[in-house]
């Protein structure tokens, strides 16, 4: 019984240490790539690049969203059984502009949270 308790304590210490080290304990961050301006009625591609160190079944990005003027236009959900394909991955979304728009995106780590909301404004030419 003492051996099982000792193993459990050691395992918990290792997991705690791994999540305390910056290389392992990482918040999910996003970058938005899109044109600065587009013609009215033009379809544009918005690329969201997501980064998070150490995506694994315990510690991973669990969601990413993309909004246009506060309205969600895309959302990706992940879990321990459906992990992101890598520590850095991208998603593309097409959007037809009728007026200037403010694009926001955010991703979240299931243990450590988000690096915050990122914003990109797209003007009409």
Task: Identify the role of each PLM range.
Residues 83-92:
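Aromatic sugar-binding surface patches on proteins
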